[in-house]
Structure formats: C-alpha cells, structure tokens
Amino acid sequence: MTLIDGKAISEQVKQEIAAEVAEIVARGGKRPHLAAILVGHDGGSETYVAAKVKACEVCGFKSSLIRYESDVTEEELLAKVRELNNDDDVDGFIVQLPLPKHISEQKVIETIDYRKDVDGFHPINVGRMSIGLPCYVSATPNGILELLKRYEIETSGKKCVVLGRSNIVGKPMASLMMQKAYPGDATVTVCHSRSKDLVKECQEADIIIAALGQPNFVKEEMVKEGAVVIDVGTTRVPDASKKSGFKLTGDVKFDEVAPKCSFITPVPGGVGPMTIVSLMKNTLLAGKKAIYK
C-alpha cells in the first residue's frame, strides 16, 4: 500500500510555481494577484482562506482579502464582484463558499468574469471542461488529477466509481476521468444517495473517488484488493482529545480500507492541500493570460 502524500506534493508544486513567478518578475513581468472575498465567520471558510493567503506568499503572488459581515446584501456583494472584474491588477479572484442563505451562490458565481474565475465554477469554465477545452478546472478535481499524475497511477480502461454528484467535486471529477487524456480514459460510474447496488459498484471499482461528505462511509468490504482510493471527505467530527475540539474525518474508514489498497489518500494531508495548490496553478495561468487573453 502506498500512501498518497498530498502535503508533500503540494509543497513541491508550490516551489515549482514560486520558481516560475521569480522568473516572470526577473523579466520585468507582473506578480500574479489573487483576491478572495470572505463573508461572515464560518470556521471552515476562515481556515481555508487563511491557507490560501499563506499559499500565495509561498508562491510569490500578491493577495488581497476582502471581508464582509454575514448581513451584507446580495447587491453589495455583486457590486464588489463587478469591481474586481474590472480591476486590471487582479488576475483572478474567488468568493469563498458557502454564502449566507439570503445570497444566491449561483448568481454570484455567474457574475464573476469567467476569465478571472480561478475556482473554475462559472458555467463557461464548467462547459469548456466538459468538452475538453482549455479552462480553469475546479480546484479539488484538478488537485486529484495532479496526484494521479505524480504517482503515475494508471487510469486508462479502469473502472472508476465517483461517490457524490456535487457541482464542485462529483460531476467535474466524473467528467475529467472519462476525457480522452491522462489521467482519464476510465469507465466511470457515479453513485449517490439514490443509487441501488452502491456497494456492488464499489466492489468492482479499480478506482474509488469518495466525495459524499459522510464520515467513514466507505468500509473494508466495499473495496477490492489493490484498488486506488481517493478520499475527498473532510467532515469536522467532535473530538474532545483535540485542541480544536474536532477531528477532520474522511469519507473512508481509513484503518480498515488502507491495507487492501494499492494507493490511498489520508485525511488530512491528502486531497486538501492539493485543492489549494490547484487554485495557485489557476492563478498563475490567469496571471500569464495562458488560457484567456
């Protein structure tokens, strides 16, 4: 069993990005600039945004954090999005999700200029991704592809089961795994809460990508010998022994499942760090105008 070390790979990728940024700046080019909008004080969002700002520093990017209280109006938020769309100094920006109930996430996503949508959530980027055109691929699926590549995991002709059908992970992941490219060319099945024979589907899978948000859902009897298991789940489960009061728990019952796998990602330290690195990669592409002029 090989443990897929997302933390180590993410550090490696950040160093590669930093070296490229140093070259750009040495040639008189502009440092990539990532802006982030954070609404309210959601614990998970605070942690993620802090990690993104820190990653920008390591990569040599300029970063800006714009904060609003959770009672900000939808119109005020959309006005800020439009302002960032028109700010030539900002190469890419994100609006950290989830947003308060009174704000339409979809409306916010669609207001972002797709050329600056480094999260890859805008329908234009999602559409381009699904037909294999250059675009900003959403961060978590992109991070998973990077892990498969760096560990040289074979995907062509393999049976891949994606657990979950969210717009952020499940759907794009399924789409990417069936592209005519590496990593891809897999035979993909998407399972979700309404699926029948979900256990049987998993038992036949060479690759399982678990993105349900249900702690310890994937058990030992669901995984065949030699499978590759990618755990996207990060649920905060209360744990009095931890200083934070919670333990980050994946969708896979790691201790039981790991011995059967050829490759597996841990939680934390697997997919999570790669998500942030993918955002950095997209920001670099935006800074270089590599995808959209």
From Swiss-Prot:
- What does the record give as its pathway? One-carbon metabolism; tetrahydrofolate interconversion
Name the positions where NADP(+) binds: G164, R165, S166, S193, T234
- What are the record keywords, sorted? Amino-acid biosynthesis, Histidine biosynthesis, Hydrolase, Methionine biosynthesis, Multifunctional enzyme, NADP, One-carbon metabolism, Oxidoreductase, Purine biosynthesis
GO CC annotation, single? cytosol
Q: Which SUPFAM superfamilies match?
A: Aminoacid dehydrogenase-like, N-terminal domain (SSF53223), NAD(P)-binding Rossmann-fold domains (SSF51735)
Q: Per its UniProt record, what CDD domains does this chain match?
A: NAD_bind_m-THF_DH_Cyclohyd
On whether Amino-acid biosynthesis is a keyword of this UniProt record, the answer is yes
The protein's matches in Pfam families, at most eight in alphabetical order, are given as: THF_DHG_CYH, THF_DHG_CYH_C
State what this protein does.
Catalyzes the oxidation of 5,10-methylenetetrahydrofolate to 5,10-methenyltetrahydrofolate and then the hydrolysis of 5,10-methenyltetrahydrofolate to 10-formyltetrahydrofolate.
Entry protein name: Bifunctional protein FolD
Q: Which organism is it from?
A: Bacteroides thetaiotaomicron (strain ATCC 29148 / DSM 2079 / JCM 5827 / CCUG 10774 / NCTC 10582 / VPI-5482 / E50)
